[in-house]
Amino acid sequence: MQQTTFEESRYRWQDSLENVAVCLPFRCPRCGDHTRFRSLSSLRAHLEFSHSYEERTLLTKCSLLPSLKDTDLLRSSELPKQGKLLRGHAKVTKQKPSYVNLYSISHGHSKDPKPFEMVAERPVSYVQTYTAVDIRADSLDAPRSSSGLPTQDTKAAFEAHVREKFNRMVEAVDRTIEKRIDKLTKELAQKTAELLEVRAAFVQLTQKKQEVQRRERALHKQVDVAVEMIAVLKQRLTESEEELLRKEEEVVTFNHFLEAAAEKEVQGKARLQDFIENLLQRVELAEKQLEYYQSQQASGFSHDTSEHMLTDISSSRKSRCLSRGHQHSVCNHPELKAHFHLKGRSYLKKAKDERAGMQPAKAIHEQAESPREFFRPAKKGEHLGLSRKGNFRPKMAKKKPTAIVNII
């Protein structure tokens, strides 16, 4: 696109130079189109300086003496014929183009081929004026020749007058043309300056356009890189979100597992605590029963009193166990209840069988004294027995952890 605009600007410069060449209206007939002049005086000086004398004489003849050959015919003609000739010359000049070949008008019937090369271009107005002046001069010379005046002097004077008048006309036309050419030259210089300004502005705009295009390409590259990075970041964000969701699901699952494990642990601890409490109660009950049996064997209580006391103690312990029990207590399990009750009953049967072999009198005496001795305060003689019982209780307490471990 820039190359085409540069070529168009170059063609415009060439057209302007061609227009400058066209503004020179007069060309040399011998040199051609490449030699042009602004005025007729410059063309004449060129012809006198550059070309031969024969060519100059032909040019003067063709430009100044075309009407002298027809003076004899015009003398015998009348004024209406002169008007007809004027109209005829006007028609001829109208049929011709803007520049007329004077040599072809004056020497139309010449046999020499060389003079046809000499062609002087003149405007149509010059030809009309020159022909009218020749006709008037011929009409004036006719009565003078008839009166007997010398025709050669009149012709020379007329030629000098016509040449002087023609030179004045040519100078006036040259001045007018020069003024017009100067005006056109100024306008051309102004247009050329404007064109140079426009061309400089065009070059500046072209450079700005190239800079803008370069920046546009750089910005396009940056935008492409940014779009690619955004796509990569979006993909990474999606992957991280998926990973986060998966981790959250794992955390939720692990939390559920921990909650279930904690709940099971709490339940297990509660059950274990209930079981240990129940076991301790049963151990305590067994110790008390053992102490009671030992005291019964030592004191010789009767069988009925022992059964009554055992039932009272067992009922009281059972009520305490039920009051202190938990929802998940081991006492509520039927298998453990049956196990402990069967074991206790077998132990009680053995104690009953041992007591059955004792004497009836001693049993009756012990029955009478058993309530009093059981509920009376301790004496000095019985202090050792009580201390022995107190010492026996910590030993059983020391044995509790081993039993609990074995049970667990």
Curated annotation (Swiss-Prot):
Family matches, as InterPro entries: FBX41/ZN365_Znf-C2H2, GenomicStab_NeuMorph_Reg
List of residues that carry Phosphoserine: S16, S139, S146, S370
Keyword Zinc attached: yes
Pfam families: zf-C2H2_FBX41
Tissue expression: Expressed in cerebral cortex, hippocampus, olfactory tubercle and striatum.
Main location: cytoplasm
Any single Gene Ontology cellular-component annotation: centrosome
Keywords for the protein's UniProt record, in alphabetical order: Coiled coil, Cytoplasm, Cytoskeleton, Metal-binding, Neurogenesis, Phosphoprotein, Zinc, Zinc-finger
Localization annotation: Cytoplasm, Cytoskeleton, Microtubule organizing center, Centrosome
Molecular functions per Gene Ontology: zinc ion binding
GO terms, biological process: cerebellar molecular layer morphogenesis; dendrite arborization; dendritic spine morphogenesis; negative regulation of neuron projection development; positive regulation of oligodendrocyte differentiation; regulation of DNA strand resection involved in replication fork processing; regulation of double-strand break repair via homologous recombination; regulation of neuron projection development
Primary role: Involved in the positive regulation of oligodendrocyte differentiation during postnatal growth. Involved in the morphogenesis of basket cells in the somatosensory cortex during embryogenesis. Involved in dendritic arborization, morphogenesis of spine density dendrite, and establishment of postsynaptic dendrite density in cortical pyramidal neurons. Involved in the regulation of neurogenesis. Negatively regulates neurite outgrowth. Involved in homologous recombination (HR) repair pathway. Required for proper resolution of DNA double-strand breaks (DSBs) by HR.
Oligomer and partners: Homodimers. Interacts with NDE1 and NDEL1. Interacts with DISC1. Interacts with PARP1. Interacts with MCRS1.
Protein name: Protein ZNF365
Organism: Rattus norvegicus (Rat)
